[in-house]
């Protein structure tokens, strides 16, 4: 799930893994597809706040090493290498 963060330009990415994942990471065009660890919350969800300029960004979550699209965001794109990615529209 993506939503506006508390500060201007911040985007909140959140995921509650279906199988209670132990490690969740976020990777996308905004961090050169280098996975960054998301913070686990008391409710079992994982959250990451990213500062982004207006634009369109492709991204995925990595749950215990498995790359997945955002199950709460139906916006998708086919990448240049033939994989399906989630899409975040900012601004």
Task: List PLM regions with ranges.
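Aromatic-rich carbohydrate-binding modules that target alpha-glucans
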Residues: 4-54, 66-91
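A short tyrosine-centered beta-strand micro-motif
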Residues: 57-59
